[in-house]
Amino acid sequence: MRSLLFLVLISVCRADHLSDSYTPDQDRVIHIQAENGPRLLVEAEQAKVFSHRGGNVTLPCKFYRDPTAFGSGIHKIRIKWTKLTSDYLREVDVFVSMGYHKKTYGGYQGRVFLKGGSDNDASLIITDLTLEDYGRYKCEVIEGLEDDTAVVALELQGVVFPYFPRLGRYNLNFHEARQACLDQDAVIASFDQLYDAWRGGLDWCNAGWLSDGSVQYPITKPREPCGGQNTVPGVRNYGFWDKDKSRYDVFCFTSNFNGRFYYLIHPTKLTYDEAVQACLNDGAQIAKVGQIFAAWKLLGYDRCDAGWLADGSVRYPISRPRRRCSPTEAAVRFVGFPDKKHKLYGVYCFRAYN
């Protein structure tokens, strides 16, 4: 206790002495760098980038080194890009680079490479974007024992649409739901995509699977059959269900297409089989549900004629609401899944560009 008291007295005396002799010239800012502080910093200039299917995009990533920590740079810099799964439980390898050695993984082969705009540029360029490329990517830079990461979200311009098959509503387990979207030129939507669609006005009272395995539905106009009339608008969450046994609808996402979507002018109405053949005779294929939604949402396609689609449903897209043509709102109108032998409808075709 005596030693401690003695030290305190010395400190007070020293402080008094400094106070008496202080001048403004003695005011200094002292920067102290911790011995174990960060010596490698990775940053993304943008947390989110936007593109569309078939386009090219640059995922930004730069790193900054402390030259005093790494000396002459005998450690080779390793750059690794991975994609985070929607549930954040796994990382999927995309691209790795170390010096002259580079490796690309899976469906990214031939489509990704480093921008290399400067010595500290780890930005990744992805070409010919697919619907599956949507998501969050992690840029990791490693030098010696030091490493740091940054995350960039890749958003795709597109449209979310609810889907159920001819069997009716609530008939798809998770795996069937994912395949159903693929069959309609789409992918199963993420929560973020559904949330953005809800903010854009999507209102749908049937619960559907999302890519993370959750079951949700968007409500902009609360009403009794859809969660209650006195509830607030929002994306209703049923939670996570058994992917094999539980059955719901699905929310799909699609984007721009490289082709022409059109209503085939034909002298007569068609059965389903006649509709398929009519498109083939015109050098095209019968259109898919994802294609009619993309044409409607992204191209403003408008046609007040009900037509067959590939899944056996009959629909028509209205961008300009009017009397007898979806008078209350712009929408892709759903007629149903009629008997394929009924000769009552036209057909929508799709011709891909080479």
From Swiss-Prot:
Species assigned in the record: Rattus norvegicus (Rat)
Glycosylation, residue list: N56
SUPFAM superfamilies, per database record: C-type lectin-like, Immunoglobulin
Keyword set, alphabetical order: Disulfide bond, Extracellular matrix, Glycoprotein, Hyaluronic acid, Immunoglobulin domain, Repeat, Secreted
Cysteine pairs bridged by disulfides in the record: C61-C139, C181-C252, C205-C226, C279-C349, C304-C325
UniProt domain Link: residue ranges: 159-254, 259-351
Ranges of residues in domain Ig-like V-type: 38-152
Classification via SMART domains: IG, IGv, LINK
A biological-process GO annotation: central nervous system development
Summary of the function given for this chain in its UniProt record: Stabilizes the aggregates of proteoglycan monomers with hyaluronic acid in the extracellular cartilage matrix.
UniProt KW Secreted keyword: yes
GO MF annotation terms: hyaluronic acid binding; structural molecule activity
Keyword Disulfide bond attributed: yes
Protein family according to the UniProt entry: Belongs to the HAPLN family.
Propeptide part(s) removed at maturation, as residue ranges: 1-9
One GO term describing the cellular component: extracellular matrix
UniProt xrefs under Gene3D superfamilies: Immunoglobulins, Mannose-Binding Protein A, subunit A
Protein name per Swiss-Prot or TrEMBL: Hyaluronan and proteoglycan link protein 1
Database matches in Pfam families: V-set, Xlink
Localization per record: Secreted, Extracellular space, Extracellular matrix
Recorded coiled-coil stretches: none
PROSITE patterns in the cross-refs: IG_LIKE, LINK_1, LINK_2
Lineage start: Eukaryota, Metazoa, Chordata, Craniata, Vertebrata
